[in-house]
Design a protein with these regions (language model features):
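N-terminal amphipathic alpha-helix/helix-capping segment at the start of soluble metabolic enzymes
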Residues: 7-57, 309-319
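Active-site-adjacent loop and "lid" segments of alpha/beta metabolic enzymes
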Residues: 103-111, 147-154, 210-217, 238-265, ...
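A short alpha/beta connector and helix-capping loop motif
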Residues: 70-74, 78, 138, 143-153, ...
Length: 320
């Protein structure tokens, strides 16, 4: 739900039709009564970054937008966390450094972006994740967020991996679209060796010719077994059609539910889902974000599937 200056409470599917600047200003949001997320920002986040941890979720808009929108999404995630008993980490990027077109919006930048993320944490208690692109960004980012993320295109950059690990924060490394699952062992070891509190690896599809991605459902077991780290499924970037649009990536968001359900049945340890009240109006990844109103119903199905899955004794890469 979201509250506007006139005191009215709006359903999430109404938010997309609203002027988001009309939502409650940031200095009043922290005063609203809230239920807390299952895992709050702080040291307890680290326990998620081990094989056998409870199932969890990374979610949020692709890029940081207005405080009103960021907090609308974060508040919804905090309620989902509480209602479903699901640990949730809020994600959003301060800089989309690999946009297809030089004219595409990139985000607010490091300083403003970290301030926006801090306001999300103050308002909701949610743990925070954001990605880093340069080694010199890591220390400042680690002062604000709970988890650093390495983008897929940078998953072999040793200096960046080491700098992220040296912060002592947990690190999520996205698997490059050209990488095999077991090849991610090198990235995991670089981060661990530098002192990270934990490491997770995220599957986000593999190139299948030009402009297409496919997901090998064996990847979760293979990565977990080879790298001794939780294997996450990115259900939104996996439906991208890279380079398909005119200067932007395309996407097939209608396939998100099927891939997410399959990944959980195949043993994914956690999910990564970008979500927005109105993806078409987002500043980035408009063609592959999940509508915020669709998130809870999908997660309810996912948790039912997760509860049903029991590893076979001989199964490769069991969750532990």
């Amino acid at each position: 739900m979201a509250e506007s200056r006139d005191g009215r409470v709006h359903a999430l599917d109404e938010v997309a039709e609203m002027d988001l600047d009309a939502l409650l200003p940031e200095d009043e949001i922290a005063a609203l009564a809230r239920r807390g997320p299952v895992v709050k920002s702080g040291p307890e986040v680290t326990r998620l970054f081990r094989v056998g941890a409870p199932f969890w979720l990374i979610a949020g808009p692709c890029v940081l937008e207005s405080d009103a929108l960021n907090l609308t999404v974060a508040e919804a995630l905090a309620r989902i966390s509480d209602d479903l008993g699901l640990p949730v980490i809020f994600k959003a990027s301060f800089d989309k450094a690999n946009r297809s077109s030089p004219g595409s919006p990139r985000g607010p930048g490091v300083d403003e972006g970290l301030a926006k993320l801090a306001r999300v944490r103050a308002a909701t208690g949610l743990p925070l994740l954001t990605d880093v692109h340069l080694p010199e960004q890591c220390e400042a980012v680690a002062e604000v967020v709970d988890v650093l993320q390495i983008p897929a295109f940078l998953c072999r950059q040793t200096d960046l991996l080491v700098a992220a690990g040296q912060t002592g924060r947990p690190v999520n490394v996205k698997k490059g679209q050209w990488m095999g699952p077991a090849e991610m062992k090198g990235a995991a070891n670089k981060v661990r060796g530098a002192g990270a509190a934990g490491v997770a690896l995220t599957e986000r599809g593999t190139f299948f010719g030009y402009g297409n991605l496919v997901v090998d459902m064996r990847s979760f077991a293979l990565m977990r077994q080879a790298c001794e780290a939780p294997a996450i499924f990115d259900g939104t970037h996996s439906v991208q059609r890279p380079g398909e649009g005119a200067g932007v990536s395309g996407g097939e968001p209608g396939h998100i539910p099927a891939l997410v359900r399959a990944a959980v049945a195949a043993g994914a340890d956690a999910l990564f889902l970008e979500t927005h009240p109105d993806p078409a109006k987002g500043l980035s990844d408009t063609t592959n974000m999940l509508p915020l109103a669709r998130l809870r119903p999908l997660l309810e199905q996912v948790l039912e599937i997760r509860a049903m899955v029991r590893p076979f004794e001989w199964e490769a890469g069991a969750r532990g």
